[in-house]
């Protein structure tokens, strides 16, 4: 979260153009959290130059490109940070415009623009089936669409939405429909990587297009919740007694579009939450005088962690016997990345006992 808090001063005190540019950068940077990525200090300094009007967005993107070309030559490149920086700059350019190609072709082109210079197959439909282990599903996966039907499914969903009328619907009904559309679009998962970030940017552009004001921090601060809510909206397991659960995504959009205050912490979305995380509260409602089961605040040591470290801590808090390999599998990370993150968390997480049969202790 500290990645984009540095832009607060521009949003509070800056000129209108500075406020707008800072808000867009916050959203672009915040969206990297869906894959546990964090931007570099160089990206933040470059963003500030753009916010202050010293350079335009294309110059900012070129500076970042040149910066990583230099690092690659020296063999000191951080691939995750490189992706986060370049994608953040690309998203900032896209969100700085109001144009939207609301079509399957436009959705695919948007993926290409977001991941230009990052992914080898940017803007290409995947030609293989995929599964993804999700920590919110206890390492189970959503059933994504098979690869043969991807483009037709995109065309169908977007055409259906194009022909849908919001006339005579209440705002609450509109929110429910928007959540259904976005959930279905994401479930197609047409690309090998970058589906959630593409869906988020497409959603922001579309909501603007149909008249909603989405110039706030919700996507910036809660992009990981957004992804997990999409997962829960598309997951069903009859054996475990779990049905599709769109209400979490609807609550995200209720906060975004209706100004409600649902507590958007990810632990409420887990399919097997502890007792204190079973009921997601609306913080905007008046609290009764009766004792409350839900926690009011997470410990500071938890909220001060990076998104990736929060994911690791959340998994270990549910199962302290997880091996590093199982953590890596559940989060879709490499073993080296997991080891590096655990090392950075050594002041609060330690492994006790033999290599096999030991457990993690959280201070």
What positions do the PLM features span?
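FIC/Doc superfamily catalytic core
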Residues: 1-363
């Amino acid at each position: 979260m500290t990645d984009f808090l540095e832009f607060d001063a521009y949003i509070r005190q800056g000129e209108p153009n500075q406020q707008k540019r800072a808000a867009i950068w916050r959203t672009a940077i915040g969206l990297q959290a869906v894959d546990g990525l964090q931007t570099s200090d160089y990206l933040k300094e470059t963003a500030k130059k753009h916010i202050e009007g010293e350079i335009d967005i294309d110059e900012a993107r070129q500076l970042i490109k040149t910066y990583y070309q230099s690092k690659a030559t020296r063999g000191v490149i951080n691939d995750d940070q490189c992706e986060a920086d370049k994608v953040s700059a690309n998203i900032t350019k896209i969100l700085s415009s109001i144009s939207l190609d609301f079509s399957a072709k436009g959705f695919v082109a948007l993926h290409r623009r977001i991941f230009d210079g990052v992914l080898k197959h940017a803007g290409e439909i995947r030609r293989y089936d995929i599964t993804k282990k999700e920590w919110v599903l206890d390492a189970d996966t959503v059933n994504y669409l098979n690869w043969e039907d991807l483009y037709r499914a995109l065309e169908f969903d977007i055409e259906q939405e194009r022909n849908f009328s919001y006339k005579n619907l209440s705002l609450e009904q509109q929110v429910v429909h928007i959540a259904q559309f976005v959930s279905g679009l994401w479930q197609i998962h047409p690309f090998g990587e970058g589906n959630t970030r593409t869906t988020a940017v497409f959603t922001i552009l579309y909501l603007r297009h149909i008249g909603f004001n989405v110039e706030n921090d919700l996507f910036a601060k809660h992009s990981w919740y957004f992804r997990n809510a999409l997962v829960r909206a598309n997951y069903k397991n009859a054996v475990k007694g779990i049905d599709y659960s769109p209400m979490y995504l609807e609550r995200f959009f209720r906060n975004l579009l209706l100004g409600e205050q649902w507590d958007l912490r990810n632990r409420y979305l887990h399919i097997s939450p502890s007792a204190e995380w079973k009921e997601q509260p609306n913080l905007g409602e008046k609290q009764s005088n009766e004792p409350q089961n839900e926690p009011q605040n997470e410990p500071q040591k938890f909220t001060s962690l990076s998104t990736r470290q929060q994911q690791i801590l959340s998994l270990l808090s549910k199962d302290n016997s997880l091996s590093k390999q199982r953590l890596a599998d559940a989060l879709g990370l490499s073993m080296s990345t997991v080891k590096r993150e655990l090392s950075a968390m050594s002041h609060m997480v330690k492994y006790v006992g033999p290599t096999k049969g030991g457990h993690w202790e959280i201070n």
